[in-house]
Amino acid sequence: VRGGGKVEVELPRPSADFQDVRVVAYPASAVGRAALTAADTRVTAAGTAAGAQCLIDGDPATELLFDGSPEAVIDLVTDADLDLRNITVWPARRPIRAEAELQVKGADGYRTIASFGIDRSNPNIEVGFYPYAPVSVSVAKTTGREFRLIVRGAGKDTGFAEVQLSSLPRVERYAEKTFAKMFQSPLPYWEEYQWRDQPVLDDASLAVDPAEVVDITECLDGDRLVWEAPAGEWVVMRTGMRPTGIQNSPAAPEGTGLEVDKMTPAYLQHHFDAFI
């Protein structure tokens, strides 16, 4: 939102059972070009169905499916330089496990700047409440106009909904780090929740400064935000919680239901007194 006066806006509620925790705002990053878009980028692909342009249309309902070839190649070409710092892939709503390689074209041809796995093979919410969560991978600042994403081992009729190449930094593997998407079997090995250090950010001004984050929770009434915003461009973030949908198991039918909130002592005590 643009500050310098009163801001009045309806904030979307993710679901009926959503419970607000905090509404915060922070200054938007001052970057000239945030990401490749459908308006400035041409997308072509081999080893897929037709219609690769849907990968950057901003609509997760449109999907590009792979045809079962051992390798699929997706080229994204733009007319102006992009300072790439992150790639985020939104899988199609179909189980997928594959290996990916991101390349940029230079004077000597394409070179690889990131290799990463994509594992959304188990959509059961027992292993993450966001079954087809995006895969976020950071790269050291890389400037280019022609990028290539090579996908190997993806099965026929799996695919991607969106591919975002961005100049803005993003936490790598944030879905996994917040347990929105966990290890894909119930028995992870010890190393499954360890991650590499992502590349050091080259421009500190692109990161959110904690000192500049403003708590505007009291400005929210229902779904309507009314805020006297300071001058500048601001990002408003509504945060909250909702049940994951996981039910306790094993249990007798009369004892089956949503798991108790183990982070709130009063609720946990009530559960203990009622059932133990």
Each predicted region: which residue ranges?
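The substrate-binding groove and active-site-proximal loops of carbohydrate-active enzymes
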Residues: W90, N124-I125, P253-A274
